[in-house]
Amino acid sequence: MEGAGGENEKKKMSSERRKEKSRDAARSRRSKESEVFYELAHQLPLPHNVSSHLDKASVMRLTISYLRVRKLLDAGDLDIEDEMKAQMNCFYLKAPDGFVMVLTDDGDMIYISDNVNKYMGLTQFELTGHSVFDFTHPCDHEEMREMLTHRNGPVRKGKEQNTQRSFFLRMKCTLTSRGRTMNIKSATWKVLHCTGHIHVYDTSSNQPQCGYKKPPMTCLVLICEPIPHPSNIEIPLDSKTFLSRHSLDMKFSYCDERITELMGYEPEELLGRSIYEYYHALDSDHLTKTHHDMFTKGQVTTGQYRMLAKRGGYVWVETQATVIYNTKDSQPQCIVCVNYVVSGIIQHDLIFSLQQTESVLKPVESSDMKMTQLFTKVESEDTSCLFDKLKKEPDALTLLAPAAGDTIISLDFGSDDTETEDQQLEDVPLYNDVMFPSSNEKLNINLAMSPLPASETPKPLRSSADPALNQEVALKLESSPESLGLSFTMPQIQDQPASPSDGSTRQSSPEPNSPSEYCFDVDSDMVNVFKLELVEKLFAEDTEAKNPFSAQDTDLDLEMLAPYIPMDDDFQLRSFDQLSPLESNSPSPPSVSTVTGFQQTQLQKPTITVTAATATTATTTDESKAVTKDNIEDIKILIASPPSTQVPQEMTTAKASAYSGTHSRTASPDRAGKRVIEKTDKAHPRSLNLSVTLNQRNTVPEEELNPRTIALQNAQRKRKMEHDGSLFQAAGIGTLLQQPGDRAPTMSLSWKRVKGYISSEQDGMEQKTIFLIPSDLACRLLGQSMDESGLPQLTSYDCEVNAPIQGSRNLLQGEELLRALDQVN
């Protein structure tokens, strides 16, 4: 028994020794293996901090990849690098917007550049030696294998095998939108545009002596560029880049306006049209496949293709397209494209599609287009030129037909009548400071601010209800030794203490010097003020065509006729002297005189002063003072004066008034008590400081106006309104045929724009004074004979009138007015 026990102990001891020796041997082998891997890791072209932390599998993986790369490099004919090439090596990876990857025929990544971490978040040593199929989308594996396959079969004579590769690959990315890295298990897919070629390396020169011939080594060299998302583009787009958005059928839903400069298209004309209509036919197959990849993988880059320009030819474009998905149901919503135009228009004289012929073929001009061009041209034209155009296109005049309810004026363009009217127009000196620019000053007048629509065609101020009015218009257009002054004054909110002005000063106020003082400019805002019903009421006329310059033989006194009150409901017939007790309830300060009752309700808004009389202090008589060059220069100085200077404007009070002395049966009401109110707009220091003469109220608020006085005033206002309106209106109709280019609409509408100007500019915050330079025709008017009785002398009091608000309900009409006039006389 003892012997058997001793043998068992010996066996145990021997087995333990063997196990210990085995462990020691394994430990020794592992240590030697570790030393080998350590030495091998340090032979790799990797930083020490990276190679020292590699496991054995990684060392073997990287070593194999390194040997394969060396094999590729040895197989190629490499030149010895000089110092210049060695310095340029560091810039090669910065040129492409991506990283370099080399794959074997079985998909192993034997090389990948170190800047892959910048785009994918994965490091170089984590990818090198691994299979590309471990990091790509499963749906792309089949396409990836096709790209790696190189067919070595026979090739047709004269045709080389295509080794170029371009495809889109979805690869794992551990980068977040904020630039942080995540775990590989949580990685997302990023679309890479991979371009490169297949390289076949023949290694037969380095084969061993045994005679065994190794097969050539096939590698796929790629440059992988990630496609940026449109929402993450950090670099601002240059002028050669435009954005576009498309629906899922590739129709435009938005396009950047920069496409107009680059290709000639307007963004509006592209909306709703397919992008395929603008592709070159030779690139349609390539782009169709690209769009298929876009819907499959989410992003694509088209590469350079040809896109047709609008007026012929094409440009080279490269597009980055991204499918935008709905955040709720993850369904595709639209496509956003970033289009880079890489060339100018090539072969611009060639037509490639029907869309390009739209800009080449001359469109058929319709009568609408011709008439629009004819009556909206700003250049000046001769009368004969206009006559020839209208003679060739007589049917085009139907476009100027008035709206329903308007009066139709027949236009006769016969040669005899035209010559007769031209002769009459030459004999009539017209006020052309607003309607016509002076030939000496070359004033520029914008035609776009004056014309009215076709339904508001200007009409002569004539009335069948008052035939004597037509004679009065013609008589007042005759030459006159007297000149007229016209002033329309509107109050302003800010009040300043009134400066005293004695009666002698007002009596020495000079007469208006020239007819140009009747003419005044208006702003382009007046076009928006007119209404059709107001124009129809103001310019009611007879249906039969009459000569506006014809005069009747019988001399009728307008004061004995019923007053013609325009049915314009915008203003009241009020002046500074006759203010009713109702004005005492106005919210305006008592120191500010108002023009009309309508203006009193708008005193919270600053208004405008339009003054046509030039400022002067010289005492004049009834004899008119001719306009000289000195007067014109004085007016120019007033216009060019700096805004900070004070320009006093004194309203004239002519002694030889049209309604005083022998010119009228009733003298003008006493206007003693005028005072000059210095208006200084402190809120606008650059505005002119105007000194405007206003009439002081002498009426007691409790007393009522005498009906006789009202009737007399209405008759006077009616005469003045018809006289002033006839001047502008008759001149406008006559000159429409004389110079139709750019002045007739402005001239014929001047009187209407005066009334609208006061009401439309009440919303402005500044007070303006507009001076007009007298023109050559105004000088002709002053140079006429002084033998005949001509234009009556009107004062500022006579001109400060407007139309009533309540119409004729409170006014005397017909026989009642005649009886009131007889009692006054």
Swiss-Prot record:
The modification S-nitrosocysteine is found at C799. The modification 4-hydroxyproline is found at P402, P563. The modification Phosphothreonine is found at T554. Expressed in the kidney, higher expression is seen in the renal medulla than in the cortex. Expressed also in the perivenous zone of the liver. Residues 492-516, 654-667 have a biased composition (Polar residues). Induced by reactive oxygen species (ROS). GO terms for molecular function: cis-regulatory region sequence-specific DNA binding; DNA binding; DNA-binding transcription activator activity; DNA-binding transcription activator activity, RNA polymerase II-specific; DNA-binding transcription factor activity; DNA-binding transcription factor activity, RNA polymerase II-specific; DNA-binding transcription repressor activity; E-box binding. Functions as a master transcriptional regulator of the adaptive response to hypoxia. Under hypoxic conditions, activates the transcription of over 40 genes, including erythropoietin, glucose transporters, glycolytic enzymes, vascular endothelial growth factor, HILPDA, and other genes whose protein products increase oxygen delivery or facilitate metabolic adaptation to hypoxia. Plays an essential role in embryonic vascularization, tumor angiogenesis and pathophysiology of ischemic disease. Contains two independent C-terminal transactivation domains, NTAD and CTAD, which function synergistically. Their transcriptional activity is repressed by an intervening inhibitory domain (ID). This is Hypoxia-inducible factor 1-alpha.
